[in-house]
Structure formats: C-alpha cells, structure tokens
C-alpha cells in the first residue's frame, strides 16, 4: 500500500495555487501526512534586469521584505482546508522556483508534490516556461498537477 508521510505544496499565493492547496490538504488528511507549504521568492537579479543600478544594501532590504511578506502569507495557509492534526511546515526560500522546490523535496524526503498550474499554452508557455513542468520532469517523487479550472474537489 502506498504511504504518504510528507506532502509538499509549493505556492506563489496566486489564485492558480488555491486548488492545489485544497487537494493537498485532502490527501494529507486521508494519509495523516505532514503538510509542507513552500514559497520561493525570486532572486533579486531575476526580478530586476537593472540590478547593477541598486546598492547591495537596497537589494538586501528588498529581498528581506519579500521574504517577510511571504512568511506572513504562509502563516495563514492552508486556512479552513486543514483538518488534519499533523504539523504544518512552512518554508520560504530564495532562488529559481523549480530548482528550490526540487531541492526542498530531496532534502525533506517529500513523498508527493502537489503543484498548481497556470494553464499557459502556446507562445506564453514558450516565453515564460513552466515551473510545474520543470518540477514534474526533475522531482525525486511523484507530482500531482492541479489545473485552476475544472472539477472541484469534494471531500466525503
């Protein structure tokens, strides 16, 4: 029988990620698994092409501000979806999202990653890439992708 002890939900706090959190909570409750919520703050160099124009102190302050905001938002998740008595692990990392998600999954021995998709296709997908796709291709464990639209998950 499959046993899931640790479930990871990477989130960017967008509406696209909310269904993934609901799915992960339901699965975690079913398996009495520990839930890991992860937000990855992009590296400053990834956010601002003119990064050389900013002082290191300014960049550090901005990065710290983004991390604090991410921690604040993680603190209220998963909200009412969580009915399991198990612990919730909340983590913020900085760097490229897909790489940080995969490294976290390896380091924490995650059994399942549940990740939302943005539903981009065509040119937008080519230009912007897909964190979910990269995670699916490189994760050390199974990955469940959850589309933002479609079937609603109902717990019984």
What are these regions (language model features)?
Residues 1-2, 30, 76-113, 150-156:
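Structural beta-alpha unit
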